[in-house]
Curated annotation (Swiss-Prot):
Record flagged with keyword Nucleus: yes
Post-translational modification: May be ubiquitinated via its interaction with APC2.
BP-aspect Gene Ontology terms: kidney development; negative regulation of canonical Wnt signaling pathway; protein localization to ciliary inversin compartment; Wnt signaling pathway
Protein's name according to its UniProt entry: Inversin
Amino acid sequence: MNKSENLLFAGSSLASQVHAAAVNGDKGALQRLIVGNSALKDKEDQFGRTPLMYCVLADRLDCADALLKAGADVNKTDHSQRTALHLAAQKGNYRFMKLLLTRRANWMQKDLEEMTPLHLTTRHRSPKCLALLLKFMAPGEVDTQDKNKQTALHWSAYYNNPEHVKLLIKHDSNIGIPDVEGKIPLHWAANHKDPSAVHTVRCILDAAPTESLLNWQDYEGRTPLHFAVADGNVTVVDVLTSYESCNITSYDNLFRTPLHWAALLGHAQIVHLLLERNKSGTIPSDSQGATPLHYAAQSNFAETVKVFLKHPSVKDDSDLEGRTSFMWAAGKGSDDVLRTMLSLKSDIDINMADKYGGTALHAAALSGHVSTVKLLLENNAQVDATDVMKHTPLFRACEMGHKDVIQTLIKGGARVDLVDQDGHSLLHWAALGGNADVCQILIENKINPNVQDYAGRTPLQCAAYGGYINCMAVLMENNADPNIQDKEGRTALHWSCNNGYLDAIKLLLDFAAFPNQMENNEERYTPLDYALLGERHEVIQFMLEHGALSIAAIQDIAAFKIQAVYKGYKVRKAFRDRKNLLMKHEQLRKDAAAKKREEENKRKEAEQQKGRRSPDSCRPQALPCLPSTQDVPSRQSRAPSKQPPAGNVAQGPEPRDSRGSPGGSLGGALQKEQHVSSDLQGTNSRRPNETAREHSKGQSACVHFRPNEGSDGSRHPGVPSVEKSRGETAGDERCAKGKGFVKQPSCIRVAGPDEKGEDSRRAAASLPPHDSHWKPSRRHDTEPKAKCAPQKRRTQELRGGRCSPAGSSRPGSARGEAVHAGQNPPHHRTPRNKVTQAKLTGGLYSHLPQSTEELRSGARRLETSTLSEDFQVSKETDPAPGPLSGQSVNIDLLPVELRLQIIQRERRRKELFRKKNKAAAVIQRAWRSYQLRKHLSHLRHMKQLGAGDVDRWRQESTALLLQVWRKELELKFPQTTAVSKAPKSPSKGTSGTKSTKHSVLKQIYGCSHEGKIHHPTRSVKASSVLRLNSVSNLQCIHLLENSGRSKNFSYNLQSATQPKNKTKP
């Protein structure tokens, strides 16, 4: 210190020279300076110290004496309010203290800590300075307190100076004065680790051995025994507990007794001492219900635990949460204590659970003590024990991220597929803790990364909630879906935007997270809405750059689209309403027209009935009827120049004039007769278009347009007629003024044998006498006013008859008919012999198309050819008129219901025939497959018979394979007459008999072919039936008529381009 002072004052001013002289003990220089300047004797330096204080610090007694004689102030204080006496007491300099006290130094002066020189004298082991001060002090001044309300006795006990304690107690110092912490000198004396502190304790207790002093508690409730136990001073504990009034089970503010502190600190000897001197015989517990054994177990003090377990009064009781000391030890990883307890207590329950269901293994897994977990598993601890939350020890380890413990538990048989009461899996808890390594371990143990809890949340959402990017990356790299929604519709992006984790948001968008997913609640917030609500500006900017929308923007877009759809709906609805209105108007127009036609038909029917009642009025008065169809060719041969061309004659009838009436006057007809030829020539140019229009109106082959034109240029509507039923007369004559013939397909029913005589009689009665020399006049007869037949009769005939178009695919069902366009239909007579009948039929069908395609495309050609055929038939047959086989009907005069019935009946018949063909094809394929399987089974059976038939089996197998793979199956034609041969007379009885004789199976297996020969529209190739000859005991299989057009497969048929070798049967 002297060197430092010298350095401090070296080269300083005059004042510094005074302090330097005091420190250096240069009495002469000090005196010279003081004589030169008397103010220098109390001059303060930068610390406020005077030369006298430096003399005390430097122990310069002679210089101090010189300064005091020069008049220096003895009570002068420095900046810390200490005087020279404080410094002398602090140093324990008895001589200076005595010098200063003789110069009347103030011993009650307090420094900034409110300490007097008396407090400072207790620091030294020698009691001389303390005794010197006590001589100058009054009796009441000995208990002066400092800033901490501590007296000199407190300091003496703290410094463990038993002599100072005795001296102060002798001078009537109070031993029961508490300081600022409530401690009395006995607390400070017991709170000492030195065994010699027992003397200080004894000095105080000897002065006042009272119970209150011995069990005095400070402001924290601790007694001197608590402090003695805490310091581990066995001698002091022994002295304190030797008094009977000492309370061993005294609680402090933590509800801990001295025994708790001894166990917590591991003082086994003190524990034994306290247990022995515990007269109550019970082990108290603290505020948590823990006994001293719990504290000893968690601190891993095996010796202390052994002392507790060996004492008979100690039991392993549970705390307030049901945990035993064994669980405390497992939670702290106290392996030594666990081994000690397992060895000393054989009845210990290792799987005992607390009130939450947790076991010792739960506690060890939660704390991450691998060695403790292994020790417990070795002692048969239950690895999948669940608590009240259905958490196993593995859940606790995953939550805290203890990888080693997780792997140890999994190796020990812990299940990884369990969930807790909220549906959280192990992966959920690992994600909530942000443990990426644990997530990877769990995924490697076959845990689904997209597993959802009962709220629908995935581990990825849990990781996104905490912003654990590494954990999120591990999950999404293992195929975790970032777009999975929970039950409220939130995704991982919602949670990241809500908490403002920008890095997590970038990671989610990199893994194709949808930025506009909406919630399922009423608000329907998107991730951008969460960012807006949290005012996450960086997140908002980033989300907007990546196409994120708020719910308001989505609603605007949806409203725009809804409006567009609604506008389109209104337009379509208006269009439908307009269309329905137009259709309603059209229906009303059609109903009015139908009603008008019905009224006209009733009127005509009434006129016809009236004409039948007076048949004489129906006959022409001056002119004969027009000749029949058989006479037309002869007339044309006599006047070829006046006959119109065949092409024009075959066209449709002329349009009817609305001005004409059904019954024209006879005079008008006579006036126009001379213009027939010219009219016929003039109307030829208009007939093609008219014929096309009339032909398009015919919906059924059984109904025809037969308009008639009057002689005055007016058109007379034709009278509808249908086929005559049996017993019906064909002699109803119709006289019309037409200019050409129209040939259209019709349903001709040839009169049966029973009808011929009756038809002839009716024809004879109704027609004029026919003469072979009779020449038809160029003038046409007027149309009779009476009609030919009643409407009711015609309706019955149409409903009862069977109509079939010329293009029908059923054999023998289609027939042609020659219809006169301008006159009544000719009366066909039954041929007198079969040759004539065959010629008639052959002539009718010889020019029909050979395929359905030709039938559809050649309607006009069919009409023309049929017309010419009619003329040929008329020449070959008897010119005498025969009974009518059918009459033409005007389709406009038929009811709509009747027309629809006819069309529907014909469609059903065609559909039935197509189904029969289809069934026949299926049966044929099944039959062929059956025969092949039968033959193969036969070959297999031959092989199993033995070696005797091996050669025969090989021959037959080779023959079958060669014939199948080389496609040499012989095709044969049906052994029937050619199609070109004239068919029999197309009578009703014949066609009906043939249709009943034939069946589908017979057509398949080739037993009957007549039904296919007489089809007028089927070609020779189409009517030929292919059949396979018997090959290797394979019976003959007859294909259907469409087998020639079936697909050619490489394994059983030749290619379509390769010629087929046909052999005659």
